[in-house]
């Protein structure tokens, strides 16, 4: 099935994963690191390298609802990563 991964500050990508996949399985798929500009790694690996872990990357949503790594996705789902806001006024 196809699932889209979108980070608010990046171009979305679409990946092919097995039915009943979890968010963690989707973000572990080869090439998903492209969301962070790292085509050679999975998004989980790229987040670990760049931010020290996925939890430092931001908030996860699936089709607009709050999600965890164990949330199941369905055909056509969109995983949205809302980056943490850094700095301030």
Residue locations for each model-derived region?
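Ubiquitin-like/PB1-type beta-grasp interaction modules and other compact soluble beta-rich domains
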Residues: 1-89
């Amino acid at each position: 099935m196809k699932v889209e991964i979108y980070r608010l500050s990046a171009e979305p990508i679409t990946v092919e994963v097995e039915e009943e996949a979890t968010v963690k399985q989707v973000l572990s798929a080869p090439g998903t690191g492209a969301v962070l500009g790292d085509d050679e790694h999975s998004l989980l690996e790229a987040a670990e390298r760049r931010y020290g872990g996925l939890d430092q990357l931001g908030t996860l949503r699936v089709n607009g609802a709050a999600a965890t790594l164990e949330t199941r996705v369905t055909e056509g789902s969109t995983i949205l990563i809302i980056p943490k806001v850094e700095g301030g006024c």
